[in-house]
A protein has these predicted regions:
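Acidic, surface-exposed loops and disordered segments
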Residues: 1-322
């Protein structure tokens, strides 16, 4: 069970909030090569907090010690649509992945302990430097993408993602212990349309957002030759995990962070369509057993039934070229 964070730092370490950092002003040449480990880690935090969170609440707090960074869930910014902390932890996983890439870029191995203290479940991860290493070319590209990446609400899709890129996106999520289902070309149009209907239903039940529904309707019904965009060039991706607990949510966040960076390298815009997975009003009668004990939403269960090979649905994404 996740609990509220302590409000006072310990005497041997200090907390670093996002507001105390200046990530948009950071320059890599200013990395304190000869500084203390704690100074180097604090510098690298600027890259971790550049990432987007699912509810745009930046639900993390970093605690810097002499030789490590501790990543905590900041439950004080909890969104009402995320009462079981699932998306909060996923968002923290994105920040964790960016921090790991920054550590590698500056020439160190990253050592990560997830949930290192069972009695302190708010502590999601402890990150420290390993031995010196040579940065890999792919890591350089991913690092450069951190400062450029952004998620968008909707962009009109004008061409298909190449199969080679789709394969790469599959591989990056697999490397973070999740499984990804691509809802384009390999899935019948009937299933794709059903997923879009679930997004619309989730929105209507959750927020009653007319602008979102209008954009969604335009996406489903293209005026060009009467071809539904959802069954032509729009690319939907469903990230799922083999388990449905805090460990799986953190791994999902790291996979999503990797995917967002890789997509950004090719100028692919990413939107989160997670409403059918969020809806609290549509709780299934079947309970799933990891505290806090919650019920899997019926809409989420329908996604799981549509794509059983994807495990537990965690994040539904729309990817396209602008």
């Amino acid at each position: 069970m996740i609990h509220p964070l302590p409000r006072k730092p310990s005497t041997t370490s200090y907390y670093k909030s996002t507001s105390a950092l200046n990530p948009r002003l950071v320059e890599e040449d200013n990395f304190p090569v000869n500084g203390k480990t704690s100074e180097q880690l604090e510098f690298l935090l600027n890259y971790a907090v550049l990432n987007p969170s699912i509810h745009n609440t930046q639900p993390w707090v970093f605690k810097i010690t002499d030789d490590a960074i501790e990543l905590y869930a900041n439950t004080r910014v909890l969104a009402t649509a995320d009462s079981n902390y699932r998306e909060l932890i996923i968002s923290c996983g994105i920040a964790l992945f960016d921090l790991r890439i920054a550590i590698r870029y500056f020439g160190y191995r990253d050592i990560v302990e997830v949930f290192p203290e069972p009695y302190n479940p708010n502590l999601l991860a402890r990150i420290s430097f390993g031995s010196k290493r040579i940065v890999q070319l792919e890591e350089k590209f991913l690092f450069r993408a951190i400062s450029k990446r952004s998620t968008e609400r909707f962009y009109p899709a004008n061409r298909n993602l190449p199969k080679s890129l789709i394969s790469e996106l599959e591989s990056v999520t697999d490397s973070e212990c999740t499984r990804l289902q691509i809802l384009t070309s390999i899935v019948p149009d009937s299933s794709r349309r059903e997923v879009i209907k679930l997004v619309d239903k989730g929105d209507r039940l959750q927020t009653k957002d007319p602008l979102f529904r209008q954009k969604l309707s335009q996406w489903i019904n293209s005026n060009h030759e009467d071809i539904p965009i959802a069954s032509s060039v729009a690319t939907l991706m469903l990230i799922g995990s083999q388990n449905d607990n805090e460990y799986a949510w953190l791994a999902t966040g790291e996979a999503l962070g990797h995917l967002l960076l890789r997509a950004r390298i090719d100028d692919v815009k990413v939107s989160c369509l997670n409403r059918p997975i969020q809806v609290p009003e549509l709780r299934d009668s079947a309970l799933w057993g990891f505290p806090p004990l919650k019920r899997l939403s019926r809409v989420r269960s329908r996604l799981q039934a549509l794509f059983p090979d994807c495990g537990y649905p965690q994040i539904l994404l729309h990817l396209c070229y602008q």
